[in-house]
Structure formats: structure tokens, C-alpha cells
Amino acid sequence: MMIFDVTKTIKYWLESAAYDLDTGRSLLESKRFPYALFFAHLALEKILKAIVVKSTKEHAPFTHSLTFLASKSKMDIPESIVDNLAEYTEFHI
């Protein structure tokens, strides 16, 4: 039986998010805007998954929906931010 390591899982999500954010930044500098947005979305998704794991002590759900992940995070997120997350989710397509 495999034991779920919360700390290791959070570290994985955050390190992966940092890598994706760096990739997105490079794409932005080279004016490849759609791809930069895609990687920015991935970074946000992974940060939210790390927060979900931290707050629930369970694996993050298998989803790309930023609004769904935000709702699972147990954070009090202003509606305007949730609206932005919904818009960002469109760039994962």
C-alpha cells in the first residue's frame, strides 16, 4: 500500500508550477502569446492543486478547471478573482 505524502505532493505541484511559469515567461518574451497564456494557466492550475492538497490532505482532483480547484481550496476568494480564473481556464483548450 502506497502512503500519500502531503509534503512531497505539494512540493511536486509547486516545483512543476515554477517550471511552467518560467516557460510561459520565455514564450511571452518571444511574443508567442497563446502559448504563454497556456503555460500561465498550467502554473495557476498547479499552484491551486498544491493549495487543495495542503487544505484537504488529499490528492488534488483531476481537472483543469481553475474555478473548480479554487472552490476546493477552502480559500475565501473574491468573486472578481473567480471570474478571472474562469476566463483563464479558456486558455487551456
Residue ranges and their predicted role:
Residues 1-93:
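Terminal alpha-helical segments
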